[in-house]
Amino acid sequence: DTRPPGFTPFR
């Protein structure tokens, strides 16, 4: 994954 730390799929 190339997502930043603390990224949440929830809006």
Curated annotation (Swiss-Prot):
Coiled coil: none
Listed GO CC annotations: extracellular space
A GO BP entry: defense response
Subcellular location: Secreted
GO MF annotation: an example: toxin activity
Entry superkingdom: Eukaryota
Tissues expressing the protein: Expressed by the venom gland.
Keyword list, A-Z: Bradykinin receptor impairing toxin, G-protein coupled receptor impairing toxin, Secreted, Toxin
Misc. remarks from the entry: Cyphokinin is hydrolyzed by ACE by only 27.3% (compared to bradykinin).
The family this protein is said to belong to: Belongs to the bradykinin-related peptide family.
Protein name according to UniProt: Cyphokinin
